[in-house]
Amino acid sequence: MARVTVEDCLENVDNRFQLVMLATKRARQIATKGAEPMVAEENDKPTVIALREIAEGKVTRDLLLEEDDD
């Protein structure tokens, strides 16, 4: 996927607000907690990787229910 759009992501989440929360949490996991990306990195930043994962259905809203290990 060359470019990720909000519409691509909204097929897998309920609304834009949930999308922001989900992408933020997943990007933090990738950037600071060492989580392995579930899509090819292609030299993208963690936020773009997170959005691509959401658009491809590899990250779901269930992630929001998980407790943070801070």
Curated annotation (Swiss-Prot):
Record bears the keyword Ribosomal protein: no
Primary role: Promotes RNA polymerase assembly. Latches the N- and C-terminal regions of the beta' subunit thereby facilitating its interaction with the beta and alpha subunits.
Name listed for the protein in its UniProt record: DNA-directed RNA polymerase subunit omega
Domain of life according to the entry: Bacteria
First-level EC class: transferase
Molecular function, one GO term: DNA-directed RNA polymerase activity
Keywords assigned: DNA-directed RNA polymerase, Nucleotidyltransferase, Transcription, Transferase
Reactions catalysed, as given in the entry: RNA(n) + a ribonucleoside 5'-triphosphate = RNA(n+1) + diphosphate
Subunit structure: The RNAP catalytic core consists of 2 alpha, 1 beta, 1 beta' and 1 omega subunit. When a sigma factor is associated with the core the holoenzyme is formed, which can initiate transcription.
Entry-linked PANTHER family: DNA-DIRECTED RNA POLYMERASE SUBUNIT OMEGA
UniProt GO cellular component terms: DNA-directed RNA polymerase complex
Family: Belongs to the RNA polymerase subunit omega family.
Entry EC no(s): 2.7.7.6
One of the protein's GO biological processes: DNA-templated transcription
Stored InterPro entries: DNA-dir_RNA_pol_omega, Pol_omega/Rpo6/RPB6, RPB6/omega-like_sf
